């Protein structure tokens, strides 16, 4: 059974996940090879699909888990994501020597986690210390401050504080009254029939 091809962009990662899921389902005896499990687990983490990641971890036979330490490393990252331990996520990702098939996925997990952290900070904080922010996004203080400035945020080097820019709220799509009335009419007609 061939292992799924490498993926480099989000569409490819989604397709790779679908291929791995299919390979797991079609595996002889219901047990896929370890690389399929590794890729699928890492891809679930990338897409922040923690429920499927947990159930996959429970499905993987113990013999495969113990024989392939990389699976344990991926699951350790998953546990840190589950606990929302952002510094721990980055530490766990950099602590392992990933195989060639898993390396790009784990780098994407790190980048996606960093983007989520930036988004969370921008929504939750009016100011945060540069040290705390750097730990939260898994960068050195200098790199974090540089990233903040690139995002259009403010950084005060004297007080070592970062002031996030609030995200632009998505504009509400206003539906014209005629469309609302037509939609309501269709709904009522459906309920009557």
Swiss-Prot record:
Q: What gene, per UniProt, encodes this protein? A: csn8
Pfam families named in the record: CSN8_PSD8_EIF3K (PF10075)
Domain annotation PCI: ranges:
8-181
**What family name appears in the similarity comment?**
Belongs to the CSN8 family.
Q: Where in the cell is it found?
A: Cytoplasm; Nucleus
Complexes and interactors: Component of the CSN complex, probably composed of cops1, cops2, cops3, cops4, cops5, cops6, cops7, cops8 and cops9.
**Keyword entries, A-Z:** Cytoplasm, Nucleus, Signalosome
Official protein name in the record: COP9 signalosome complex subunit 8
Q: Tell me the Gene Ontology biological-process terms attached to this UniProt entry.
A: COP9 signalosome assembly; protein deneddylation
* GO cellular component term, pick one: COP9 signalosome
Q: Which Gene3D superfamilies match?
A: 1.25.40.990
Any idea what job this protein has?
Component of the COP9 signalosome complex (CSN), a complex involved in various cellular and developmental processes. The CSN complex is an essential regulator of the ubiquitin (Ubl) conjugation pathway by mediating the deneddylation of the cullin subunits of E3 ligase complexes, leading to modify the Ubl ligase activity.
